[in-house]
Amino acid sequence: MAKDVFNNSLAENVSFINTSGYYNNSENVTYINMSMNGSFSGILYVKSSYKNYTITINESGNFVFNDTTSPIEVELLNNYSDVILNYNLNESINNFSDTSYLILNESCKNSYFNVIYGNSPMLYVSLHDEDFNHNITIFNPQKGISSKGFVLTDIFITTPRMFYSSLNNSFEYQSWNIN
């Protein structure tokens, strides 16, 4: 449990993106499925040795990328260029599955995204709004594997609130319920 208390709370919720995909090397086609719960806007890159694709992502969907030849890099970024997921596919590693979590500020859905990622024993929360970038470190996160490492599968954020600290000139977290 990590706890800091400041004034001027901002209620937040959690969005997540389930992404899976595979590369069919006999057809030179890459298939990607994205399922979103909550709000997200970002860019999906599929880079292959023959053809590259760039797609704006803001809803769930199934995507087919033709004329992709190994090696293939699949990368999802948010609007602030934080890497949400990154996978390299080839003939021997031809599929992936990933769950990425984001904390989203309800009051400004399109301009404030917080990426949660990290490797044990630390979890990082990268905060962005129009005026600043700020990082918070949470120690000893619990279970969960993603392309970025140890993440939030079993970390439940019950009533997360962000508080602005005029002393530190930054947003801080109040309550993360880690189960």
UniProtKB/Swiss-Prot annotation:
It comes from the Archaea. This is Uncharacterized protein MJ1282.2. It comes from Methanocaldococcus jannaschii (strain ATCC 43067 / DSM 2661 / JAL-1 / JCM 10045 / NBRC 100440) (Methanococcus jannaschii).
